[in-house]
């Protein structure tokens, strides 16, 4: 996730008005340096993967520094082709478009996947992005079919898209019936776009229903969100509020807060319903005003982790929030959101977080 989100932040920034002040010139230099670095780093990664032949999708590195490749049904499979697409958008170098198409088209069968909710990540990052820049009928069809597949997970009586199946794996051991995780907000853009492309309002209505139920049940009074809310699919009653990846059920998992800020910003983009933007702002304020947020604005992996300041940082969460901030500035231009996003990008661009050239598996962030 960290690859895609940094590039998204850079791309959103470069589409803002021309820089005219010294501070803006400074961040412009940072961004241009990051783009140059990203092209060199990803060129090295493609050499490692292979520019032709069998498609292998990178996800991370193991403890020995070796590349970890994933099957196409892994939830992260769309991030690498999406990153290649952003490099094409940022450089206008068609070699990146060709590679993005190659890795994107390897995910063709995912449009029919119905056993988990992450198709929004997988197809949204890949097909939806490349369709914006290189539209064709096959890509459009894949986007709409993926939305149709995702909607099979919509539990009408509860009004939500079920995130995980509970009949196997570790999810079957938690006592859940219809778990919904905050990550699911990142799937809704795909549904909104499917309605725009097809004219079928079904996808839009599912997205709005899910956003509303999540707004109603997933957030605390301070604006932070639970990771998992388990529903009774027969009547929509909330059965549990827990975590799967945070420190504790009542803690604030950093990436989950980022999903919420970004997800509700996107919902506002499509619907112009102010309650979505208000929730994005409320969760953002929780993050930015949290006493455990470091000065460089890169959060610890959980705001309530027990060993702060000796806890890992979450660069992916910071990059996701930076991307949301650049967009939120379009809607609330007097709130200083661009300056906050610039601070995050400067931090992520520093040696503390940006990988050395040719190191870290040729990923961008450490």
State where each predicted segment sits:
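Bacterial Sec-dependent N-terminal signal peptides
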Residues: 1-29
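Glycan-recognition and catalytic cores of secretory/periplasmic carbohydrate-active enzymes
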Residues: 23-366
């Amino acid at each position: 996730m960290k690859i895609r989100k940094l590039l998204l932040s850079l791309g959103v920034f470069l589409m803002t008005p021309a820089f005219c002040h010294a501070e803006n010139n400074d961040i412009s230099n940072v961004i241009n340096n990051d783009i140059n670095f990203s092209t060199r780093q990803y060129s090295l990664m493609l050499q490692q993967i292979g520019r032709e032949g069998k498609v292998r999708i990178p996800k991370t590195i193991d403890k020995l520094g070796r590349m970890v490749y994933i099957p196409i049904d892994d939830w992260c499979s769309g991030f690498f082709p999406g990153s290649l697409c952003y490099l094409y958008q940022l450089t206008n170098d068609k070699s990146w478009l060709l590679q993005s198409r190659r890795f994107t088209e390897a995910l063709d069968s995912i449009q029919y996947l119905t056993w988990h909710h992450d198709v929004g990540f997988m197809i949204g990052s890949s097909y939806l992005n490349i369709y914006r820049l290189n539209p064709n009928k096959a890509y459009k069809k894949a986007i709409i079919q993926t939305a149709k597949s995702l909607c099979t997970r919509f539990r009408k009586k509860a009004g939500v898209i079920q995130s995980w199946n509970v009949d196997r794996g570790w999810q079957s051991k938690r006592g859940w019936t219809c778990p919904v995780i905050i990550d699911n907000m990142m799937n809704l853009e795909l549904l909104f776009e499917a309605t725009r492309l097809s004219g079928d309002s079904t996808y839009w209505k599912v997205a709005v229903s899910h956003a509303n139920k999540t707004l109603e049940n997933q957030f605390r009074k301070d604006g932070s969100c639970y990771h998992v809310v388990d529903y009774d699919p027969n009547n929509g009653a909330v059965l549990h509020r827990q975590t799967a990846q945070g420190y504790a059920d009542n803690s604030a998992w950093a990436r989950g807060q980022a999903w919420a800020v970004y997800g509700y910003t996107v919902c506002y983009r499509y619907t112009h319903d102010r309650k979505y933007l208000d929730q994005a702002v409320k969760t953002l304020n929780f993050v930015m005003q949290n006493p455990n947020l470091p000065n460089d604005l890169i959060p610890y992996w959980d705001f309530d982790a027990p060993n702060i300041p000796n806890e890992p940082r979450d660069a992916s969460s910071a990059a996701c929030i930076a991307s949301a901030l650049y967009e939120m500035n379009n809607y609330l231009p007097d709130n200083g959101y661009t300056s906050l996003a610039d601070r995050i990008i400067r931090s992520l661009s520093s040696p503390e977080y940006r990988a050395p050239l040719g190191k870290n598996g040729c990923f961008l962030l450490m």
